[in-house]
């Protein structure tokens, strides 16, 4: 056996390992973009939670913000709205579920649909809801519209009361309430 034949196996082994390593790197470079595209994009991550300053919202008025591509109604209700919503018996409602992500499975009483203040008291003053009709996804009109002093969806005639509960029309459910909480006296965190 000559000296050249001893090196042939070593050269062959080197070429085999170098080719295999190159194949692994090329495969990884080709597969990584496919895996990485499944991660949430920066705009989705940014919209997961937002903070809304409600210090300028006067009693009896409403603020609409965009969250996750949908309108969110933030209403600071007056005493008349609160009394009207709390006077409705549960049996008079078409949907008796609160549809509140903060209180899953709760009944649709006014207290279960409103947002407690930063100190934990729930006076019923703050109501935060997705502004999307549960019938076909239209945006209801606010400013105490409709027959029940809440919201009215002009697309197909759904009427919601001052707590966002369906009272009349084709909508099957109450307006949804997103995960929300006060983080201080004047700031609400959505999501």
UniProtKB/Swiss-Prot annotation:
Cysteines engaged in disulfide bonds, as pairs: 138-155
Mode of membrane association: Single-pass membrane protein
Domain Rieske: 94-189
Catalytic activity: a quinol + 2 Fe(III)-[cytochrome c](out) = a quinone + 2 Fe(II)-[cytochrome c](out) + 2 H(+)(out)
GO MF, one example: ubiquinol-cytochrome-c reductase activity
Classification via InterPro entries: Rieske_2Fe-2S (IPR017941), Rieske_2Fe-2S_sf (IPR036922), Rieske_Fe-S_prot (IPR014349), Rieske_Fe-S_prot_C (IPR005805), TAT_signal (IPR006311), TAT_signal_bac_arc (IPR019546), Ubiq_cytC_Rdtase_Fe-S_su_TAT (IPR019470), Ubiquinol_cyt_c_Rdtase_Fe-S-su (IPR006317)
Cofactor(s) annotated in UniProt: [2Fe-2S] cluster
One term under GO cellular component: plasma membrane
Residues that coordinate or bind [2Fe-2S] cluster: 133, 135, 153, 156
Protein localization: Cell membrane
Organism superkingdom: Bacteria
Uppermost EC category: translocase
Complex formation: The main subunits of complex b-c1 are: cytochrome b, cytochrome c1 and the Rieske protein.
Stated family: Belongs to the Rieske iron-sulfur protein family.
PANTHER family: CYTOCHROME B-C1 COMPLEX SUBUNIT RIESKE, MITOCHONDRIAL
Miscellaneous: The Rieske protein is a high potential 2Fe-2S protein.
Name of the protein in question: Ubiquinol-cytochrome c reductase iron-sulfur subunit
Provenance organism: Rhodobacter capsulatus (strain ATCC BAA-309 / NBRC 16581 / SB1003)
